[in-house]
């Protein structure tokens, strides 16, 4: 009888150990293990927790998929430094009389009357 009880207890203990090991193998091994989330689950997680759950790989992919920023002027003939310097100096050397000749006060008078 005593041998039968110890055999049953040993069998039950081994069974419980194997069941525990079998169930623990499907548990996440790491705290932040990457999972395959469905799109609906991702939308839920984004709404509930912000963008914390998006994986680093998808962030890197988003950055690599973006188009490169374009230049402001699509003109392929850019000014050289000496050309830009001469244009700047010419604009700085304009006399104040030339600017006053181009100044049209009637335009401002019409605008102020319209906005009155």
Swiss-Prot record:
Annotated stretches, region: Disordered: 55-77
Cellular component, GO annotation: cytoplasm; dense core granule; extracellular space; transport vesicle
Subcellular location: Secreted; Secreted, Extracellular space; Cytoplasmic vesicle, Secretory vesicle
Location, primary (coarse class): secreted
Record-marked site positions (Cleavage): 35-36, 52-53, 72-73
Keyword Magnesium applies: no
Pfam families with a match to the protein in the record: Spexin
Propeptide: 27-35, 50-116, 74-116
Tissues expressing the protein: Expressed in the type I glomic cells within the carotid body (at protein level). Expressed predominantly in pancreas, testis, kidney, brain and placenta. Expressed in submucosal layer of esophagus and stomach fundus.
Keyword Oxidoreductase: no
Compositional bias segments (type: Basic and acidic residues): 55-73
GO biological process: long-chain fatty acid import into cell; negative regulation of appetite; negative regulation of heart rate; negative regulation of renal sodium excretion; positive regulation of gastro-intestinal system smooth muscle contraction; positive regulation of systemic arterial blood pressure; regulation of sensory perception of pain
Induction annotation: Down-regulated in omental and subcutaneous fat of obese subjects.
Signal peptide: 1-26
InterPro entries to which the protein is assigned, alphabetical: Spexin (IPR028126)
Keywords: Amidation, Cleavage on pair of basic residues, Cytoplasmic vesicle, Hormone, Secreted, Signal
An example Gene Ontology molecular-function term: neuropeptide hormone activity
Similarity field: Belongs to the spexin family.
Role noted for this protein: Plays a role as a central modulator of cardiovascular and renal function and nociception. Also plays a role in energy metabolism and storage. Inhibits adrenocortical cell proliferation with minor stimulation on corticosteroid release.
Listed name of the protein: Spexin
Organism: Homo sapiens (Human)
Lineage: Eukaryota, Metazoa, Chordata, Craniata, Vertebrata
């Amino acid at each position: 009888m005593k041998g039968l009880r110890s055999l049953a207890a040993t069998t039950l203990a081994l069974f419980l150990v194997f069941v525990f090991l079998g169930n623990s193998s499907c548990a996440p091994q790491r705290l932040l293990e990457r999972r395959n989330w469905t799109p609906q689950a991702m939308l839920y997680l984004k709404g509930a927790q912000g963008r914390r759950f998006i994986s680093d790989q998808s962030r890197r992919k988003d950055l690599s998929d973006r188009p490169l920023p374009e230049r402001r002027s699509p003109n392929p003939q850019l000014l050289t430094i000496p050309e830009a310097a001469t244009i700047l100096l010419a604009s700085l050397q304009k006399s104040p009389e030339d600017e006053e000749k181009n100044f049209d006060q009637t335009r401002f008078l019409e605008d102020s009357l319209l906005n009155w």
